[in-house]
């Protein structure tokens, strides 16, 4: 907690967002902006390539993805996730709120249960999809590129 916040008497609410963030697009910006509104400090865990099992491997290498996410004004700090345990970096960050995207396969209830077992008291919030966005997925961007150039 910053000294400025302590002096002002403001409560710091640390929000944690997670994701792959391959081929950054408006959907990612919506997700992170909405997550930021839930608190006054936004941390982001960028998934390691070795931990992504539910979809194709990212096009952009993990070090470049975390650098891009770190460069966004809405983000206070982005870090790479663990290569063995998804909850490891969460213990270090100590969030008050954890956000998950509309398309993430995790159940809010199961995450909260796992967090509770680890002694982490954080609320889990699912962020809604950005409406009216035809290219709000890395897969759709890749499909469009293939359509136009192959």
UniProtKB/Swiss-Prot annotation:
Catalyzed reaction equations: FMN + ATP + H(+) = FAD + diphosphate
Keyword annotations of the record: ATP-binding, FAD, Flavoprotein, FMN, Nucleotide-binding, Nucleotidyltransferase, Transferase
Annotated residues for binding of ATP: 20-21, 25-28, 103
GO biological process: FAD biosynthetic process; FMN metabolic process
GO MF assignments: ATP binding; FMN adenylyltransferase activity
EC nos: 2.7.7.2
Cofactor: a divalent metal cation
Pathway(s) annotated for this protein in UniProt: Cofactor biosynthesis; FAD biosynthesis; FAD from FMN: step 1/1
Transferase listed as a keyword: yes
Known partners and oligomeric status: Homodimer.
Similarity-based family: Belongs to the archaeal FAD synthase family.
HAMAP family: FAD_synth_arch
PANTHER family tied to this protein: FAD SYNTHASE
Function summary: Catalyzes the transfer of the AMP portion of ATP to flavin mononucleotide (FMN) to produce flavin adenine dinucleotide (FAD) coenzyme.
Protein name: FAD synthase
Organism: Methanohalobium evestigatum (strain ATCC BAA-1072 / DSM 3721 / NBRC 107634 / OCM 161 / Z-7303)
Name of the gene encoding the protein in the UniProt record: ribL
